[in-house]
């Protein structure tokens, strides 16, 4: 089976290491775990790897976050991957920092990347792995928070959290979403 694993983030060096780019961080950790490198391709950087009998297409869209749907649709069509075999890795302000939550579908929760993917797909029925950022920001400072860098304390915890995310992603591809949610959520 073939899966499309999409890490959401903003392109450009100024966004490296920001909270909003934690989707890129998770997909980078997966590529590193698989010993594969990303190459520039249409609509983003792509890497290919295998996990047992599953073929994974890893995607970091090079569109801005709010246009991620174009990249997702293109690679779904290019690789003939059904929506049930797409997993989007995304940041989430509604979850406490470091919480990882796998969902089979759902609203965009105010996330412009998820909103655009749903608009382009015409459906909210696609899986997402949400990485909790927490809500430790003053009213009206949400944008500054997500575009800001992790604190040193948070940064120290990220390697273990991304390792855990890699386990969840692999389980999604090998055991399916329901068994993976039962085990990890």
Curated annotation (Swiss-Prot):
Top-level taxon of the source organism: Bacteria
| EC class of the enzyme, as a word | hydrolase
Do the record's keywords include Nuclease?
no
List site positions: Discriminates between blocked and unblocked aminoacyl-tRNA. 10
Question: What Pfam families does UniProt report for this protein, alphabetically?
Answer: Pept_tRNA_hydro (PF01195)
Q: Name one GO biological process term.
A: rescue of stalled ribosome
Q: Site Stabilizes the basic form of H active site to accept a proton: give positions.
A: 91
Main location (coarse class):
cytoplasm
Which EC numbers does the record give? 3.1.1.29
Keywords linked to the UniProt accession: Cytoplasm, Hydrolase, RNA-binding, tRNA-binding
This protein's GO CC annotations: cytoplasm
Where along the chain is the active site annotated? 20 (proton acceptor)
The reaction(s) catalysed by this protein are: an N-acyl-L-alpha-aminoacyl-tRNA + H2O = an N-acyl-L-amino acid + a tRNA + H(+)
Give residues annotated as binding tRNA. 15, 64, 66, 112
Q: Where in the cell is it found?
A: Cytoplasm
Q: A GO molecular function for this record?
A: tRNA binding
- Quaternary context: Monomer.
Q: Provide the function of this protein.
A: Hydrolyzes ribosome-free peptidyl-tRNAs (with 1 or more amino acids incorporated), which drop off the ribosome during protein synthesis, or as a result of ribosome stalling.
Against PANTHER family, the record matches this protein to: PEPTIDYL-TRNA HYDROLASE
Entry's family note: Belongs to the PTH family.
> Could you identify this protein by its name?
Peptidyl-tRNA hydrolase
**Which source organism does the UniProt entry give?**
Porphyromonas gingivalis (strain ATCC BAA-308 / W83)
What is the taxonomic lineage of the source species?
A: Bacteria, Pseudomonadati, Bacteroidota, Bacteroidia, Bacteroidales
Please name the gene that encodes this protein: pth
């Amino acid at each position: 089976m073939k899966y499309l694993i999409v890490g959401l983030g903003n392109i450009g060096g100024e966004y490296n290491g920001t909270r909003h780019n934690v989707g890129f961080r998770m997909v980078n950790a997966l590529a590193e775990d698989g010993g594969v490198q990303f190459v520039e391709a249409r609509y983003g950087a792509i890497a290919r790897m295998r996990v047992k009998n599953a073929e994974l297409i890893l995607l970091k869209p090079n569109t801005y976050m709010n246009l991620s749907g174009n990249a997702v649709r293109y690679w779904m069509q290019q690789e003939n991957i059904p929506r049930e075999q797409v997993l989007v890795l995304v940041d989430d302000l509604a979850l406490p920092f470091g919480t990882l939550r796998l969902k089979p579908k759902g609203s965009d929760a105010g996330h412009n990347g998820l909103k655009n993917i749903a608009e382009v797909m015409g459906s909210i029925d696609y899986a997402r792995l949400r990485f909790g950022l927490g809500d430790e920001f003053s009213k009206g400072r949400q944008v500054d928070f997500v575009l800001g860098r992790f604190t040193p304390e948070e940064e120290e915890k990220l390697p273990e959290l991304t390792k855990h995310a890699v386990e969840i992603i692999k389980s999604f591809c090998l055991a399916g979403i329901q068994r993976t949610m039962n085990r990890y959520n």
